UniProtKB/Swiss-Prot annotation:
Cofactor info, note text: Binds 1 siroheme per subunit. Binds 1 [4Fe-4S] cluster per subunit.
Needed cofactors: siroheme; [4Fe-4S] cluster
Protein name per UniProt: Sulfite reductase [NADPH] hemoprotein beta-component
Record-stated family: Belongs to the nitrite and sulfite reductase 4Fe-4S domain family.
């Protein structure tokens, strides 16, 4: 294998794969025709990420298949590009049918990036799902890989004029930063190959050093966890409620690598204010600076947060201003006071229409012996002429329900037990990444662990008469940050089967990273810690003081102030 060098240093092997890929084509088509294996070769398994897919296998049956001298049960996970999380009822129905009939797991997974994933797609079914998405006006381009990922924004664009405007902006940003290569259409949609020279004026022929994430938030609600992103845009309104521009945050990211203290979660830094009409120029300039300055030697240090720390805010700001031809103005005052979704019925801009946020535990839309979520949503989609909107907390909004249809849909919700009247505030404040059995990076359970674990936490809360309170609790199977555990009041990250690192001290509004409290401990040990600290909190907290704020004030953990300096202290 030929290793690429630049400035006499070895580049990451991903750089070789991208450079030799012919603008993301590789030999994917050849692998699609290879019936001897259910997967793609090593290089193509990286390239299909740029087309919105991950190669995975079912880890529950990996050993059994190995004993039978079979290759792992290789399958793909596909992630749709859905800026702002908006999907029509008809699109939902078609996706629901495909997931039911053509995937191994018959489920739809709502994600913290405000889109849906389909797990368990076998290689012969791949062209079918891409062609279905295309027929529906959707695609999965650039939802993985070293590109700008799905752009997220505060969930319900029909809540106010500003919410609608930021949804429109999320779509514009997504389109503006898409790869220009025709590889997706040629491979998956059988589009005729035209002899022409591909060009990537924004991303370059080797794309970005690592993934890039953008979020747009409307204060005072930080439902998107805006500080966790490479680029965060905080909407600023004038005195009449009109959107005038954005405070710009740069350099957030929650992933880290165990044992490597040069990696750490980091909250984005404030850079300044930019007027609405100029925001696309700034977004493009931030992307191109990261494209050119990001670390292509060590992927652990390739994210924007490390670029910022390496050169400093002042130098990075000056380069962005030079490239955009704009100047950052001072930040406008803003404040976040809450996260999470607003469950239940609300009216929006048009008083004739209703919107209902449903709790979907861990975002897993499936039918079980206890509840027919998938069937219920399918029946609603058949009579609902509006939209479904996915939230960044893995929940679902049935939106734009006309007054005339409200009773019909409410009856269906009751029939299938979807109203969630029995769901506690604590459960609504908890979420997990997928982890086992499909994620190859998972070290411990997360999605399958969380429901029973939350029940145990609820028992602790009840023990201290805290049933009406809630703690933001998040679990991930590894330290990569998918469920944003590094902005939770209680964060668990998997270390091994049945073992987790326990982090405490994040806050309610998503503006503080928690600190490691106990390392590599079992569920029983975690619950013992929580019993003691929650009991302390119940006895000694100030009025309305949250758990995360209490454990910091009480000295149970020290606040993380500047994570590149004090996260590991």
């Amino acid at each position: 294998m030929i290793m690429l060098k630049y400035n006499n240093k070895l580049l990451s092997d991903n750089e070789r794969i991208k450079k030799n890929s012919n603008f993301l084509r590789g030999t994917i088509e050849k692998d699609l025709d290879n019936n001897l294996t259910g997967g793609f070769n090593v290089d193509n398994a990286q390239l299909i990420r740029f087309h919105g897919m991950y190669q995975q296998d079912d880890r529950d049956v990996r050993l059994e298949r190995m004993n039978q001298k079979l290759e792992p049960l290789i399958n793909m996970m596909l992630r749709c590009r859905l800026p702002g999380g908006v999907i029509t009822s008809q699109q939902w129905l078609n996706i629901d049918n495909f997931s039911e009939e053509q995937t191994l797991y018959s489920s739809i997974r709502l994600t913290t990036r405000q889109t849906f994933q389909l797990h368990g797609i076998l290689k012969p079914k791949l062209k079918g799902i891409h062609q279905l998405l295309n027929k529906l006006g959707l695609d999965s381009i650039a939802t993985a890989g070293d590109v700008n990922r799905n752009v997220i924004c505060t969930a319900n664009p029909m809540e106010s004029k500003v919410h609608y405007q930021i949804w429109e902006l999320s779509k514009k940003i997504s389109e503006h930063l898409l790869p220009k290569s025709k590889a997706y259409a040629e491979i998956w949609l059988n589009e005729k190959k035209i002899e022409s020279i591909d060009s990537e004026p924004i991303l370059s022929s080797v794309y970005l050093p690592r993934k890039f994430k953008i979020a747009i938030a409307v204060p005072p609600v930080n439902d998107v966890d805006v500080y966790a992103n490479d680029l965060g845009l905080v909407a600023i309104k004038d005195n009449t409620g009109n959107l005038i521009g954005f405070n710009v945050l740069i350099g957030g990211g929650l992933a880290m690598t165990y044992g490597d203290k040069s990696t750490y979660p980091r909250m984005a830094s404030e850079f300044g204010y930019i007027n609405l009409q100029d925001i696309l120029k700034i977004v493009e300039s931030v992307i191109t600076v990261q494209r050119d300055w990001g670390d292509r030697y060590n992927r652990r240090h390739a994210k924007t947060k490390y670029t910022l720390v390496k050169v400093g805010i002042d130098i990075l700001k000056k380069e962005i201003e030079n490239r955009s031809g704009l100047k950052f103005s001072p930040m406008y005052p803003y404040k976040f006071t809450e996260r999470g979704d607003k469950f239940g019925w609300i009216r929006g801009i048009n008083q004739d229409y209703w919107h209902l946020t449903l709790f979907i535990e861990n975002g897993r839309v499936c039918n079980t012996s206890n509840i027919l979520i998938k069937k219920g949503l399918s029946e609603i989609a058949k009579v609902h002429s509006g939209f479904f909107r996915i939230t960044t907390n893995q929940n679902l909004i049935i939106s734009e329900i006309h007054q005339d249809k409200k009773d019909i849909i409410e009856d269906l919700l009751k029939q299938y037990g979807l109203l969630g009247d029995f769901v506690t505030s604590q459960r609504k404040s908890s979420m997990a990444c997928v982890a086992f059995p499909t994620c190859p990076l998972a070290m411990a359970e997360a999605e399958r662990f969380l429901p029973a674990f939350v029940t145990k936490v609820e028992h602790v809360m009840s023990k201290y008469n805290l049933q009406r309170d809630a703690i933001i609790l998040r679990v991930t199977g590894c330290p990569n940050g998918c469920a944003r555990a590094m902005l939770a009041e209680i964060g668990l990250t998997g270390r091994g089967i049945g073992r987790y690192n326990l982090y405490l001290g994040g806050n309610k509004n998503g503006t503080r990273i928690p600190r490691l409290y106990k390392e590599n401990i079992t569920e029983d040990e975690i619950l013992h810690v929580l019993d003691i600290t929650i009991g302390d909190w119940a006895k000694n907290r100030k009025t309305q003081e949250s758990y995360g704020d209490y454990v910091v004030r009480a000295g149970i953990v020290r606040a993380v102030i500047n994570s590149e300096e004090d996260f590991y202290l």
